[in-house]
């Protein structure tokens, strides 16, 4: 079966209030400080990440293919959207408690989703990860889930979900019964 075309590029979620967020650059002290902390924690990081701000608050982070392995500098941020795809990230405990709605972590080394438990994630992209379990996604409002090429076999964590799109090509999933009643 052919693999479907890649989904569209990361688009940060709409900000919760006011005007659209701006792209934080060197002129933003908060972004400059975060870039420096990311570089210190990840020596191979060259500062190519982009951050979206509104009213001085960082709301979204675009960090694909940035050689990040340590996400600790992001701990405590109230991010609504994040793309960490293509990074050698193994664990995501520092994302715990974030109000993430969109999270892209394709082609990472992440194997545990439990730190995401309770997050309001609507779109989650896990393509190409070594993930074997969806534990942690129970009861989440996920509508779009991309998990092509993962090692997940059991999708029971998605039972009762509001799932509208599920991409699971090249996975060993064989039982779709947990999705009965999904929209």
Give the predicted meaning of each segment.
Residues 4, 12-65, 164:
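The feature captures the LRR N-terminal capping module
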Residues 43-69, 76-111, 115-183:
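Concave beta-strand-loop units of leucine-rich repeat
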